[in-house]
Amino acid sequence: MTNAFIRRPLGSRAAAVALAVALGAALPAAAFAKNPMVGGAPMYADKTIVENAVNSKDHTTLVAAVKAAGLVDTLSGPGPFTVFAPTNAAFAKLPAGTVETLVKPENKATLTKILTYHVVPGVHTAKALMAEVKKGGGEAQLKTVEGEPLTVTSKGKKVYVTDAKGSTATVTVANVMQSNGVIHVINGVLQP
């Protein structure tokens, strides 16, 4: 009995392998990666930062702040952006009344400054951030949309972000891929 696979011409097997490799290479890596759940909700790589964030029960304060600052259209746009997204618990660590004061219309400029300090142009995955930290001899500077830099450091597999005032937040959920960038969930609010 002859094995049909062995009898198939070598050229057709090679062509099939080449086609499979070419098709795989044509798809972005994010298509193969499963996004982590955030705030009890699935995050979809084909949705925007805003479309995903509104579903996270851990980011209701951030979403309300983004709306109050008028940044919904920006963060729904093409980007790409890297967003360091503070949780509700991170906002709760701020002095009492801070969030309520910031979301008032008269404080829109200050709120916008704080929120855009959490956004960096481009897609910076945790792996890319760690490579930049290594290249920088232990730290990397990222220029934010607000204009001031954030300092990124790492220890083991953890990534830390330090603001202009010296406060450090830990990335608790990394690489939440979006159609217009990436979100890294953090446990602190960064301040320029």
Residue map of PLM features:
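Bacterial N-terminal signal peptides
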Residues: 16-26
